[in-house]
Amino acid sequence: MKLFTGLIFCSLVLGVSSQWYSFIGEAAQGAWDMYRAYSDMIEAKYKNSDKYFHARGNYDAAQRGPGGAWAAKVISDARERSQRITDLIKYGDSGHGVEDSKADQAANEWGRSGKDPNHFRPPGLPDKY
């Protein structure tokens, strides 16, 4: 009986720990996907393309699995919060940027939910992206 209990306990511990390793790996890969989309957005400097890159980064990260989707949400939320703080400092409580922030969050959610990020792709954006 003790041997059986020990085997069950060990299998549970190993099963849970392997899930954590998977989650952590997915989160790291998802964070990299988000960084790559941000880098591409900076490199492209293409007018009206930010929503596409938001959706693409979140989409790519979420495709990694639950860890990637979690990383995408955390990074997206942190970015929007920090942007709101800088808007308050720069413009005061004028509401400047609130609509853009909401549109960014909608694009983020669109991508995380598995919908095609090309929905936000502006005409003429180079195929490289």
Curated annotation (Swiss-Prot):
Induction description: By bacterial lipopolysaccharide.
Cysteines paired by S-S bonds: none
Ranges for region Important for amyloid formation: 19-44
Renumbered residue ranges of the record's region Disordered: 92-129
A single GO BP: acute-phase response
Gene3D superfamilies, alphabetized: Serum amyloid A protein
PROSITE patterns: SAA
Signal sequence extent: 1-18
Keyword Repeat attached: no
Reported tissue expression: Detected in liver.
Xref: InterPro entries: Serum_amyloid_A, Synovial_Prolif_Regulator
Record keyword Secreted present: yes
Gene Ontology terms, MF aspect: heparin binding
Keyword entries, A-Z: Acute phase, Amyloid, HDL, Heparin-binding, Secreted, Signal
Annotated Gene Ontology cellular component terms: high-density lipoprotein particle
Subcellular location: Secreted
Record's function text: Major acute phase protein.
Remaining remarks: SAA2 is more amyloidogenic than SAA1.
Similarity annotation: Belongs to the SAA family.
Subunit structure: Homohexamer; dimer of trimers. Can form amyloid fibrils after partial proteolysis; the native, undenatured protein does not form amyloid fibrils (in vitro). Apolipoprotein of the HDL complex. Binds to heparin.
Related illness: Reactive, secondary amyloidosis is characterized by the extracellular accumulation in various tissues of the SAA protein. These deposits are highly insoluble and resistant to proteolysis; they disrupt tissue structure and compromise function.
Protein name as catalogued: Serum amyloid A-1 protein
Organism: Neovison vison
Gene that produces this protein: SAA1
